[in-house]
Design a protein with these regions (language model features):
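General beta-strand structural signal in soluble alpha/beta enzymes
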Residues: 4-5, 45, 71-75, 96-97, ...
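Gly/Ser/Thr-enriched, mixed-charge loops and adjacent short helices
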Residues: 12, 107-230
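Short glycine-centered, acidic/aromatic-flanked micro-motifs in structured strand/loop junctions
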Residues: 45-48, 177-179, 249, 333, ...
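Phosphate-binding and adjacent anionic-ligand microenvironments
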Residues: 234, 271-443
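Proline/glycine-rich low-complexity loops and linkers
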Residues: 125-159, 164, 250-323, 330-331
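N-terminal small/polar loop signature for handling phosphorylated ligands or for N-terminal nucleophile
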Residues: 31, 42-106, 190-248
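An N-terminal, well-structured beta->alpha segment
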Residues: 1-62, 66-67, 148-175
Length: 443
């Protein structure tokens, strides 16, 4: 598609994604869901803490009400909170304004349908046609113009649902959380407070510009120091819209999404709560995770990269747990998309039930050394088809002699090619990755 990628419509604010785009998305969505149901559409809208999110919210809501929809504003909330409230409140559509882990200058618009799933591609194609002027929708007039509703109660209900999902106490547990100066800043602490934890929060003072800046799940160093210096039991880091979660164990070591899948998968399987004894990682997950799951008596079925593809594979096979190394973890029995705060609660459930530290729980998961890089390119398709790049990939694979692997793929949200190499030792992984990266950088 032209505008919508694997994680919505994303771009630099007022460059790749403009207020005109936001207004037109609102116009089409407001009309589409009303016309198809012969009544006013009800659309719920959330945003992250970027300066531009407020601008895009105003444009989007203007478009919605101009087409006759009632717009319910959740204000700042994690992306999974929008999906949760779309379903709980029986809304026709949910819209989140966020560029997730990207820098503050970027932004994005994600849409979910009434079931809380990411919007069907056929609807997104209709929106793109309207943006490009290939179709028209009428303006509402008179009493058909929509209303704007301050819906802070929806955010409060989302927080209450997170608390209610935890049937355990965290009394006496010292937990560090890094809110990335994003959507988790006003949501995560109340959840852990309600469960009795001793919570030490960092990076929860958003100013519109500091979202994801040297903090959160893409910059774990400060949380690692925080856990060690404060003598905490565990730490959790979210990204800008809090749909991802990575952890830090009591020794200050990062626990990535693959390790979280392992810990939760083994625990759920032990208690008969893992459907089919199967976990759904992605093709980019560490091969060591697959082998470790097999040694623990579990199966793995891989999906494409992106939580949309993970959940599609989970639905297809009736599986209940899946996720990505980056920290998107989906617990299919209670949610339809990655939820960073929910993930941290599920990890705490395992720690409390098993009476083990996070380092003890992750110890059996033996990951292979990896090397990763994202290389900016002008044309992603042309880059992958380039003969020099193809030769570099073949040479890198040959250098690993069947004891590792390389994965080279297009990003679904940025103009980059992502290169991943795995090998028995770090030096071999680094060498394979650098060989391919050099070929891409030479284009």
């Amino acid at each position: 598609m032209k505008y919508f990628g694997t994680d919505g419509f994303r771009g630099e604010a007022n460059v790749g994604l403009t207020v005109e785009h936001a207004y037109k998305i609102g116009r089409f969505v407001g009309w589409y869901y009303g016309a198809n149901r012969e009544r006013k559409a009800r659309v719920i809208v959330g945003k992250d803490t970027r300066r531009s999110s407020y601008m895009f919210e105003a444009a989007l809501v203007s478009g919605l009400v101009a087409s006759g929809a009632d717009a319910y504003m959740l204000h700042v909330i994690p992306t999974p909170g929008v999906a949760h409230q779309t379903v709980e409140g029986c809304f026709d559509c949910g819209i989140m304004i966020s560029a997730s882990h990207n820098p503050f200058c970027d932004n994005g618009i994600k849409l979910v349908n009434s079931d809380g799933f990411k919007m069907d591609e056929d609807v997104l194609e209709l929106i793109e046609d309207y943006i490009d002027g290939k179709s028209e929708v009428p303006l509402a007039t008179g009493n058909h113009i929509g209303a704007t509703v301050d819906y802070m109660q929806g955010r409060n209900r989302y927080i209450a649902s997170l608390i209610a999902s935890a049937n355990f106490s965290l009394q006496g547990v010292k937990i560090g959380i890094d809110c990335a100066n994003g959507s988790a800043s006003s949501v995560a602490k109340p959840v852990f407070d309600a469960l009795g934890a001793d919570v030490r929060v960092i990076n929860a003072a958003p100013d519109g510009f500091n979202i994801n800046v040297d903090c959160g799940s893409t910059h774990m160093e400060r949380l690692q120091r925080h856990v060690v210096e404060q003598g905490l039991d565990v730490g959790f880091a979210y990204d800008g819209d809090a749909d991802r979660c990575l952890a830090v164990d009591e020794r200050g070591r990062v626990v990535d999404g693959d390790q979280i899948l392992y810990v939760c998968g083994v625990y759920l399987n032990k208690h008969g709560r893992l459907s089919g004894g199967t976990v759904v990682p992605t093709v980019a997950s560490n091969f060591g995770l697959i082998k470790s799951l097999e040694l623990a008596g579990l199966s793995a079925v891989t999906s494409g990269v992106g939580d949309r593809h993970v959940y599609a594979k989970m639905r297809e096979g009736g599986y209940s747990l899946g996720g990505e190394q980056t920290g998107h973890t989906i617990f299919g029995d209670i949610e339809r998309t990655g939820d960073g705060i929910m993930t941290s609660l599920r990890v705490m459930e395992v720690i409390r039930a098993e009476r083990e530290t996070l380092s003890q729980l992750t110890a059996p998961c033996k990951l292979l050394p990896q090397a990763q890089v994202a290389v900016h390119v002008a044309d992603k398709d042309a880059a992958l088809e380039n003969m020099g790049v193809q030769n570099a990939i073949a040479e890198a694979e040959a250098s690993l002699a069947g004891e590792g692997r390389v994965l080279v793929r297009k990003s679904g949200t940025e103009s980059v090619i992502r290169v991943l190499a795995e090998a028995p030792d770090q030096a071999s992984a680094d060498a394979a990755m650098k060989r391919i990266a050099a070929a891409l950088e030479a284009l």
